[in-house]
């Protein structure tokens, strides 16, 4: 592009190099033209065979066009194959570029194709999807759509891609013939040499096919030593093969070209014989054994053809399961390791390598009966009865010296009442049931070693020994599915198997660490307390007890307090009872330090040990002892001399005075003096 500056103004001159570009494009090599035609044929092949030979769970299949257009996808949804309008436009753009025409106005070109797609009606050739539906979301995630608006998604076999391309090309050629701007322009072969004849009886698509066959570089192959890379599908009509570039209407009418067309056909006949040697072998021309035929047929297959068939793993690798040799079968002995049973739902995290922890316990297996694993934990839940019984009948019975089935003879019942009846149906049914029971027992108690290719075994504990003096044997088994067994009412006592005392807990449950709830789930008894008092007597009577709380219903809004200080001692609830604070009384000895103060109580020191209830002195005895000590106190003179700062004073009677001393309830001395002689205050102090 050249730029010319004139009068300080920039003028851009377009299409100056148009003639030079056309000269360069016209000199395109025949190999490039052949490659473009081959890519068009590959796209047509994908559009015709995309819905063939899909995998079981395959949903989408793609075909890569180029870096500009991306992929074209065939989507399998609701048992139908779909293609979006965006992918249809991509196919038309790709074919137009490979044909040699560059798209100038892309938006207008797409509008013309979408206008043709309106002829495909909903329900017949397409389905109408609502905005942001599940199908549109899937297509948008896989780059099949540009938006999730309400639009049509077309059925795969209802779209005529060749007709859409021919109609788009015809519109542009008609605009060019009328000197109107078109959406595409020719830039390369074979579009440069193609001319549309509107007066001809042949439609545009037939003229286009005829021109594409004429533009194949077949005439230049004679000078080359290598054979041409031509596909058989492009030479369906041998009459259209020409050597020289002639006008469109003169194909097949020239007499000079007649002897050359058979030579072209003769050139391809030896190639067919070389590519397809199977016909010679099948006709008996070669004397080879039948087992050599598959090898020869595999060699004669074209390596460039990509297969569309997908083989399962069982076909490609038939001996994959036997790649690892199993462990040698051996009987159960005390020294032999016991591998746990392999379950269907075993996880890799639960697996562990084979080590010394798998050694069996030193006891005989015949002493400990084997309990079968429930079917719900070792087999899939959706197995039908027919599949279950058929799988048992197909498996062979394995005999082990220590297997319980070796000495348990299910075929010989203790009492058989059906032997006197000569009925064949009964005997057959009996033998079938016995064989079925034996095989079912063998299915779950296979004591032989099993193979583990990765060297890992399920990390379950080995079987526990059976102890008749212990708990229930079902609870001692280390396998999942114990909830499938129900305890019979006459077999054992559930209360014995599940004791509620704290001594039977192996691990303290986390509920014991939490505070007690406000609601206590116990039955309401009017004559008993709802809060347990001790382990031996959980519900204490409240009729003869004055220091305990009265009975409270557990269903009431107010629950019994768990922090009260007047509860009796118990193993479940340990409170600090009868612990009084130390208060030092002024003017008293150290032996009189502990004095009760009404109902006020507080927690004592942590190191203080309280005496048992039957050794402690009652509150009434303590008060009585204090009163006796108060009456036997020393004289006031000694107290005043010992404690001069004491405010309490007691007057003593003398022969010259008549004084009455009265003791108050508070322990203080209050005296009332009656002096008949009216002595002066200086001699004796008045009583306060």
Curated annotation (Swiss-Prot):
Bias-annotated ranges (Polar residues): 217-226, 588-604
One GO biological process term: pseudohyphal growth
GO molecular function per UniProt: DNA binding; DNA-binding transcription factor activity
Modified residues (Phosphoserine): 214, 226, 400
SMART domains referenced in this protein's UniProt entry, alphabetically: STE (SM00424)
Post-translational modification: Phosphorylated by the STE7, STE11 and STE20 kinases.
DNA-binding region: 57-167
Positions in coiled-coil regions: none
Keywords attached to this entry: Activator, DNA-binding, Nucleus, Pheromone response, Phosphoprotein, Transcription, Transcription regulation
GO CC annotation, single: Tec1p-Ste12p-Dig1p complex
Compartment list: Nucleus
Entry superkingdom: Eukaryota
Residues the record lists as Phosphothreonine modifications: 29, 289
Similarity comment text for this entry: Belongs to the STE12 transcription factor family.
Known partners and oligomeric status: Interacts with mating-type protein ALPHA1.
Classification via PANTHER family: PROTEIN STE12
Miscellaneous section: Present with 1920 molecules/cell in log phase SD medium.
Designated name of the protein: Protein STE12
